[in-house]
Amino acid sequence: FYDRKEIKDVIAYLRLVYQPNDRMSFSRIVNVPTRGIGATSLEKFLIWQASSGMDIIAALNNVEQTSTITARARTALANLGTILRNIQGMVQAGKTPAEIIDSLITATGYRDYLLDGTPQAEERDANIGALLSEVQVFADLAEFLEEVALVSSADTNAGKEKVTLMTIHAAKGLEFPVVFMVGMEEGIFPSSRVYEAGPQE
């Protein structure tokens, strides 16, 4: 499911919002949907962004400060910056991943971009609908992106013999044939406060 192009596109947007210096995600979404930003303008923007000390989203919102990029590309980059800044605001306001994705695909015109009249268009749109349903169980964006990273990692390593090192919180809900819990020291983990609270009803 997470290997489908449309799902990867949406997740790249979310990763960039969550980690504004994620160049790989930015490179994936900068022209999705098409914004008319050429390779030369993109390269000049990234050089300027790196020298400015700003993260990618901040640089997009201050792109008028550079004259090395064409006016048309600056406008397109600034518009993208406004969308991403607004989505960042939703994350900071504690909106759910479903609300964030819904706003994102509306603001970017991504759904219209998917419905391009090809035979695959409806299937792609249905996949976005399935993603919106799937994220309902996540309270915040960080939790969802962590789950995506775990699923992607599991898919990559499927069938390989390996040891997976993770926190107890990251392991919640997962199943393994053998589990070793290290650092279990009474009073530290579980916390001594567990015993002070008394039995749960």
Label each residue range with its predicted role:
Residues 1:
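Conserved phosphate-binding/catalytic loops in two-lobed NTP-binding clefts
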Residues 4, 11-201:
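Conserved helicase C-terminal RecA-like lobe
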